[in-house]
Amino acid sequence: MKAKSICGTSPSEIQSALQQNMGDGFKPTLAVVFLSVKQDRVAVCKILDDAGIAIYGATTNGEFTGEGVSAGEIAILLLDINPAYFTILFEEFPDKNFRQITQFIAKKALEKFAHPCFLIAGSNLNTDAEALLHGFEDILGKEVNINGGMAGDDFAFKENFVLTNKKSTNNGIVVVVLDEDKINMKGRATFGWKPVGTVKTVTKSEGNHVYTIDDTPVLDLTIKYGGLENVTPENFALEHCITLTMQLQRENGDPVMRAGLVVDWNDHSIYCSGHVPQGSKVRFSLPPDFDVIEKVIKGCEELKANEIPEADALILFNCAGRLLSLGPLISEEINGIQEVWNVPIAGMFSNAELARATKGNLEMHGFTACTVVLKEK
């Protein structure tokens, strides 16, 4: 399987880049499209559709290829996978029946392939991404191979989209179903944040709404451990969410990051980026330093050494929170990941990352870099 990545600031630039990269006889069959919500999605999809290319796409909080990181632009990974080795499924969930929709997708995938694996992207801030994962597990078991992310909208947190040929939705899912007998897909989710303090107990929560930890309002604890001062609704900013990160402990595998997204100032509770069950164990996180990047790259080196030594292409779902917290250093992380396999890469800064925790279960992650490695068998 051959892969090439292209990028551009407009549909016309994508048209030119596509023509240039197909000039040597390269005939891509699948495009992994990451683009700003400000871009003309219909025009970009028409260019690819007219070229006979199947589309898996999502809007982003920033996008990148090996050429560098951009905001407000378009990044595309072109693959010439045999069309018999994949199919694309697209569904909406207006009734919030997330689990049932992915159960249906899993059943459809089994009609096509005996051993399917999945590259997924979901849209809508109200989508229960964990329910999406559970739906696949219901049909295919706990070991199902899934990687992906949730769409963004340039940090507006209002409306994001997933897309395919002639379709896009702000409330749905797009899935590339791969034949795992023909295509090897491996993923590695790594965050690298260091824990601080003792293990604590969530004493009151409902879903993703955390009220108290060790019977103390959760905002008060995060102010303490984050070293914040004079925190008020007026001076609280998105960047403070970087401080409000908890490591949710799991019985099996690595912890899972949960970031604070919204504060309820009436009771100092916090709405988090995913479920935090009452009674669960958590630790707070230190603000990131440079070895966060080193840990992510080391995780990829271990993946290469132990599971997939060669690759045809890389896709990276990197949390938007990592971009906020690491700033320009994020380019070093992306470059370091690409250099492990030295193949074309494209990726997005996502609202959430969907992947198996290292030595653990499928999870919805936050502040995590989810590297997806593809290799034709």
What does each of the following model-derived ranges do?
Residues M1-R41, C45-A51, A58-G327, S331-V343, ...:
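Small-residue-enriched flexible segments
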